[in-house]
From Swiss-Prot:
This is Proline--tRNA ligase. Catalyzes the attachment of proline to tRNA(Pro) in a two-step reaction: proline is first activated by ATP to form Pro-AMP and then transferred to the acceptor end of tRNA(Pro). It catalyses: tRNA(Pro) + L-proline + ATP = L-prolyl-tRNA(Pro) + AMP + diphosphate. It comes from Frankia casuarinae (strain DSM 45818 / CECT 9043 / HFP020203 / CcI3). Belongs to the class-II aminoacyl-tRNA synthetase family. ProS type 3 subfamily.
Amino acid sequence: MAVLTSRSTDFPRWYQDVLAKAELADNGPVRGTMVIRPYGYAIWERMQAEVDSRIKAAGAVNAYFPLFIPESYLRREAEHVEGFSPELAVVTIGGGKELEEPVVVRPTSETVIGEYLAKWTQSYRDLPLLLNQWANVVRWELRPRLFLRSSEFLWQEGHTAHADEADAAAYARRIALEVYRDFMTQVLAVPVFVGVKTRRERFAGATNTMTCEGMMGDGKALQMATSHELGQNFARAFDIDFLGADGARHLAWTTSWGCSTRMVGGLIMAHGDDNGLRVPPRLAPTQVVVLPVRDEETVVAKARQIAAALTDAGLRVQVDARPGLSFGRRVTDAEIKGIPVRVEVGPRDLAAGNVTLVRRDTSEKVPVPLAEVATRVPVLLGEVQADLYAEALALRESRTTDVATVAEAARAAQAGFARIPWRLVGEEGEAELAEEALTVRCIQTPDGGIPEAGSDADDLVCLIARSY
């Protein structure tokens, strides 16, 4: 009997099977909430570490702001509150008494952080002010799906203030490219289209939204991260101004940007196969699992010795010698969890001075001399990383179709992405597509670049797809 539903038979059911069998997450007691299990959280911690290092390299520093936000704060930016109102969780009672003013459970933090950007920004010398926080947020979700859409999720949100529009725009673009795109291509091994959102899809209160869009294994799009230029909308609402070098007061220009645990769902759907997860080595909490074939003292001792050598080589290694579990069961567990490389240690191989290396992505088995394990495994991990990216890129290229009409785009987007000149779609065509549950995922320049904010050049193209 198959452990997992086949992806080709029922992709949504397969996704749920992987969540359960790989021990990634479970449903929480309140509809729309989730429990992230230790292995799922270990993957998220690896994502955090990689993204956080890139955020810090871009000059931002971490801080933390309150979970509860006065309702009046949200009302100070009209478009923002209108965009989030249907998703808000509002607290009206505290300590057994009705609150004088209801407080909103953080859906995003532009408003509360805006209050403190105003407090901390006095002079042009204080700018740019570049902040980030790792937190949980609540957006009441009517159609929850673990990691993809949940009422509470974990994320990072960056918020910055700048002295001029050009600096703010350049920084928002830098985050989209040097933080998000770099992480997704270099670590997550998911190729992404980076472009701007249409006015219809733009973040509430933003003047421009940049997005990273990945193609999942079923051809649907997943928004992996966004970076927003907020213009002076929030600066005006929260009095974020400063004394300029010219001696006059000026409003600041602000940005916000974020990615979330939704990326764990993207990892599953972009790389998973009928045997479970396939985790890229640069991301994997455990890059190598060493499996003794038999529960014999000499075999287990050699497995631990090999693991120690691989750990000394800088790899993340686990020995699975759990008593009472067959070798086959331990292999299945390693496959479902997507550990990139297995080192199988058996008495016959040891007698010949070898072990067997097994790639999770291809199931290819290679006998390797014991003396070469510590040098061969890192090379193999590099090959797995590159091949997973190449496979995802090949899928995207094979399922992205250039079309010339909105009707053709609607047909092509049933199986993948449709690419079409934006001038042939426009807001009218976008509304037509919405009736068929299709969206314009992003607008790009002809060479796949990010257009300048507000550009209406005739040669812009857009990507249309079904989405999560």
